[in-house]
């Protein structure tokens, strides 16, 4: 379980879920920690070289934002740095092998997603329903 970093100021409080490098590709890192405001992903994508790796790694961070319904703040040395909103829209971005920064001024909160509440249990329920449907159709077919 990853610890949440809490920053408290006089009129401001924020809880960050830090995910280092490839941890962003694992959904379980997020759903073992549900009480956070933003996902912060720090990565060194230089070891991917000129492959498609940095792009795939970045796309995983977009999915984590959508699943959790939270902003992803991504900083990547030699990779793609970006701010991704909870709907998966890349609001600001510094492209691969470019230097720069992005300002994050305001955030929008959305209601928790079904996936952020129940995680992979949804898929277990879908499998169970599918099995029940198979047995139901077989029963109807045999009558």
Residue ranges and their predicted role:
Residues 1-143:
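Solvent-exposed soluble domains appended to multi-pass membrane proteins
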